[in-house]
Amino acid sequence: MKIEHVPGKNAGKIMLYALSTCGHCRNTKNLLNNLGVEYDYLFVDLVQGQEKEQVIALVEKWNPDLSFPTMVINDSKCIVGFREDDIKRALKL
């Protein structure tokens, strides 16, 4: 599985599970880029085979509805959807 890393300032451990064709996912990535924070992301729809099952199980742990984007912050907080204010608040920005 190909987890991509985006360098930036440390605002905690940020993992973004997204779909490559999702507009809300693109908006969330753009927000993180504009905020200049470091984060990792994975396009779940591009993962194949058994790895895809593992990723889906991981996302469902945080978001049983399996909707995107799903952002996990510091392995403790989950934000689902493009929620600009919630993201800024969670990252203390």
What are these regions (language model features)?
Residues M1-E4, I56-L58:
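A generic local structural motif
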Residues K2-D40:
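Local sequence-structure signature of Cys/Sec-based thiol-disulfide redox active-site neighborhoods
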Residues C22-C25, G49, V80-G81:
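Loop/helix-junction capping segments adjacent to catalytic residues or to phosphate/diphosphate-binding pockets
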Residues R26-N30, E53-Q54, F82:
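Generic recognition of short, well-ordered alpha-helical segments
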Residues G36-E38, P64, D75-S76, L93:
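Short glycine/proline-enriched coil/turn segments at helix->beta-strand junctions
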Residues V44-D65, L93:
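Thioredoxin-like thiol-disulfide oxidoreductase module
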Residues A57-I79:
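Short, structured active-site "lid" loops
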Residues I73-L93:
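Non-catalytic, surface beta->alpha helical segment in thiol-disulfide oxidoreductase systems
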